[in-house]
Amino acid sequence: MYELVYRVLLRRLPAEAAHAAGFWLIRVAGAVPGGPWLLRRWLAPRDPVLRVRALGLDLPGPLGLAAGFDKDARGAASLGALGFAFVEVGTVTARAQPGNPRPRMFRLPADRALVNRMGFNNAGAAAAAERLRKRQARRARWAGRATGPGRGRNPVAVGVNIGKTKAVPADEAIAD
């Protein structure tokens, strides 16, 4: 599936547009009724030997996604359905900010590399917190419907990466 989507669509787009399109596809697949179930069924590893206990959490596997992909806490459930046991959202700053001017992400094909100079573009801490509150409320409604590590509607653990708002002077970073 990745080869098809990547070769046919994403590779032909500028890097930042490919990132946005890929994330949109993941979110849509996770929002369609039955979508998360299908994603987990087709793509997520389910071998019990992969289960991990870390930081007091029972996780369905050892693989997580670091900050930078889901900057605004919009797709943790969909990313969990792909098989990530934990997702770090952000980097989130206290205030919304646009990030660096474009182009700010580009490919270096000869080096098989991607350069990211995004600059913490995000909708701000209040927006991310509201999305996470809504996610938690949805999880609470589904509590008790499935048991055990990595089970239930949205089994992915979520962390938040925080950063300094660009407009804030360095000596005020802690207060920010």
Enumerate the language-model features and the residues they cover.
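An N-cap/entry alpha-helix motif that binds or orients negatively charged groups
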Residues: 1-52, 116-121, 125-126
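Conserved, mostly hydrophobic/aromatic
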Residues: 14, 65, 87, 128
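Conserved alpha/beta-domain cores
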Residues: 59, 67-69, 80, 91, ...
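Flexible glycine-/small-residue-enriched beta->alpha junction loops
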Residues: 92-124, 135
